[in-house]
């Protein structure tokens, strides 16, 4: 499966993943809204929005 793995508003990059899902985490800090993308569907702390999906590049 192919997932996006760029940070925040960086140009789109992708990676091939062994997992069958991709994730997109969104949170805010002193720098503003932060976004992290990658493979799998990790556990997150409260206050972090997590979206997981199951198709190629679905986490852009």
Swiss-Prot record:
Keyword vocabulary terms for this entry: Acetylcholine receptor inhibiting toxin, Disulfide bond, Ion channel impairing toxin, Neurotoxin, Postsynaptic neurotoxin, Secreted, Toxin
Tissue: Expressed by the venom gland.
Disulfide bridge partners, by residue number: 3-22, 17-39, 41-52, 53-58
Signal sequence extent: none
Record SUPFAM superfamilies: Snake toxin-like (SSF57302)
CDD domains with a match to the protein in the record: TFP_snake_toxin
Gene Ontology annotations for the cellular component aspect, listed alphabetically: extracellular region
Similarity remark: Belongs to the three-finger toxin family. Short-chain subfamily. Type I alpha-neurotoxin sub-subfamily.
Protein name listed in UniProt: Pelamitoxin a
């Amino acid at each position: 499966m192919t997932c996006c793995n760029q940070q925040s508003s960086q140009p789109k990059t992708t990676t091939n993943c062994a997992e069958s899902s991709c994730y997109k985490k969104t949170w805010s800090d002193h720098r503003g809204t932060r976004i992290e993308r990658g493979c799998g569907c990790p556990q997150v702390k409260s206050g972090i929005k997590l979206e997981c999906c199951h198709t190629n590049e679905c986490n852009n």
